[in-house]
Amino acid sequence: MLKSLTRHNIPKEHPRDNSLKIRANLSDSFDNGIISQFGLIAHGRGEAFDYILGETTPKISLKTIHVATAQLLLSDSVISVNGNSAALCAKSIVQLANLTNSKIEINLFHKSKTRANKISQLLKKHGAKDVYGLNTKYLTKIPGLKSNRKYIDKRGIFLSDVIFVPLEDGDRTEFLKKMNKTVITVDLNPLSRTSAMSDITIVDNLVRVLPEMIKQSRNMSNLSESDLQKIIKKFNNKKQLNLILKYMSKRLIDLST
């Protein structure tokens, strides 16, 4: 059925039009070697949490997006890209990188040179000039991390202050923090290790987050460094996660009555 929908266009009248288009895109991206089979599983897990959010961005998450955008504008930052984020939002990633003067670096858990090159080509198709994380000459390791995501670019993540890692895994977040990096993540699961360990956790769907960050980057581009610092200083990630958990709990209670 998914292949049929991909070929014949999903009708706009379908109540889950956007979700089906995303699934079809991911299915095609798997066939094209952009994402791994594990990426499909990860997306399904996230989609379950998006149902609880009502497939909309809560006001609580909008506040976190505001803080995350301020942090990117203020810092020497890198957007870390994996297969799913590239498949879902390659164009938006490039736009956000340009607006915030962030570097783009590919980092894969299920490492494949072929897949990394395909992701790079996709990003460059949407206007990316430099994509880091491909040239083994410049790769180094995150101290202590054992998975394939330990490899980072000396010119990118290694040098940067802030790492924006949508769809991240908890292990790498932990070790990036040990390197004194500020970690921003997008995770639909507020209970994950990544959510708990990151400095700024946006609980929302990446396909909604990035367009909002692009919008806010444009709106905030003229703010002074001190104004951006004030926005960040007031933020408490643990408090925001507690608020989003309460929001999701209330949603479930309301739906059950």
Locate the predicted segments by residue:
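Long, charge-dense
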Residues: 99-149
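C-terminal functional extensions of proteins
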Residues: 193-257
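Short glycine-rich or small-residue beta-strand-to-loop segments that form or flank ligand, phosphate
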Residues: 75-82, 103-108
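A short, gly/pro- and small-residue-rich
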Residues: 170-191
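Glycine-rich phosphate/diphosphate-binding loops that line cofactor/substrate pockets in enzymes
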Residues: 64-77, 94-100
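Active-site glycine-rich loop that binds ribose-phosphate moieties when present
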Residues: 63, 139-158, 164-171
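Short, compositionally biased "basic patch" segments
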Residues: 12-67, 115-122
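Gly/Ser/Thr-rich loops at beta-strand to alpha-helix junctions
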Residues: 81-91, 110-114, 168-171
